[in-house]
Amino acid sequence: MVSRLLSLVSLCLLGAKHIEAGVTQFPSHSVIEKGQTVTLRCDPISGHDNLYWYRRVMGKEIKFLLHFVKESKQDESGMPNNRFLAERTGGTYSTLKVQPAELEDSGVYFCASSQ
């Protein structure tokens, strides 16, 4: 049963500052079964047009997934496959959806923002 579980972990480590409200990402972690859908959300720092998604698989380096400017995708060269869908609504928050999730999707997912 444990081997059927898929852990998708979402942490906010990039782009946050103590001076102002930082990037907010949730859920902070998610454990799901293979085949289920997981949706991660990133709220950038207010006024930031650029939003980035990254993923780190255990034992490997952080990999770029995609970059938005406002609601427009600028570069999605790092998106793994067609089961991954990212959107940015009105240039504000972004969602990253994995459907259906597979074991190889396990990892730490990061988002960051910049002006």
Curated annotation (Swiss-Prot):
Occurrences of domain Ig-like (ranges): 22-115
InterPro entries noted in UniProt: Ig-like_dom, Ig-like_dom_sf, Ig-like_fold, Ig_V-set, TCR_beta_variable
Ribonucleoprotein as UniProt keyword: no
Family matches, as PROSITE patterns: IG_LIKE
GO BP terms in the entry: adaptive immune response; cell surface receptor signaling pathway
Subcellular localization: Cell membrane
SUPFAM superfamilies xrefs: Immunoglobulin
Principal location class: membrane
Intrachain S-S bonds: 42-111
Complex and partners: Alpha-beta TR is a heterodimer composed of an alpha and beta chain; disulfide-linked. The alpha-beta TR is associated with the transmembrane signaling CD3 coreceptor proteins to form the TR-CD3 (TcR or TCR). The assembly of alpha-beta TR heterodimers with CD3 occurs in the endoplasmic reticulum where a single alpha-beta TR heterodimer associates with one CD3D-CD3E heterodimer, one CD3G-CD3E heterodimer and one CD247 homodimer forming a stable octameric structure. CD3D-CD3E and CD3G-CD3E heterodimers preferentially associate with TR alpha and TR beta chains, respectively.
Designated name of the protein: T cell receptor beta variable 14
Source organism: Homo sapiens
